[in-house]
Amino acid sequence: RVGRPTCFVVQGTTQDESGETVYLLSRAAAQRACREQYLDQLENGSVIPCTVTHIENFGAFCDVGCGISALLPIDCLSVSRIASPADRVTVGQQLLCAIKNRDEQDRIVLTLRELLGTWSENAACFAAGETVVGIVRSVEDYGVFIEIAPNLAGLAEPDTALHPGQTVSVYIKSILPDKMKIKLVVVNKNLNQKMRFEPHYFVTRGRLDRWIYST
């Protein structure tokens, strides 16, 4: 772009017809050097910013910088099971993720769920007696799992009128930390609104060495 500073790598020199020195510059070489330098800084567990570029059924692709694309698999988006990555993120959304794996071909796999807190950290944000909005994630014979935070879901009584993805209002009947269970009561199943929880980060920088959801 005119007027914008740009990096190049000098690959050689020559002379023009008047004898003046002409420098042979490569923008591509500068981009490769930038990419390699950036990759050298990335380690498994590193928390980095990224931007969602496109979404597939199996995950979301993200730009992690210097034009480097990484995969955020659907099962790494949160502890709660979702039908599609689009239930959690949108194209253009900026995220914080941790590097789950980087192989010898510099293919990078990301994870988001480890940054969204353990069961205890999420449960501490709620209290029995509250009424909150949740998203139905699974309807089973023995009950309905309803997400009240990306890494936290509770169980309500069976209800065949509910379906995955439905937004409902729920009353928190009890929170049982020793059993890691939350009992919910659906109080309004007709909210008629599509909802997606925004990420609530419990980790925003540094490097993850280990993570146990049940702690």
Question: Each predicted region: which residue ranges?
Answer:
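Single-stranded RNA-binding regions, centering on S1/OB-family and related RNA-binding modules
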Residues: 1-215
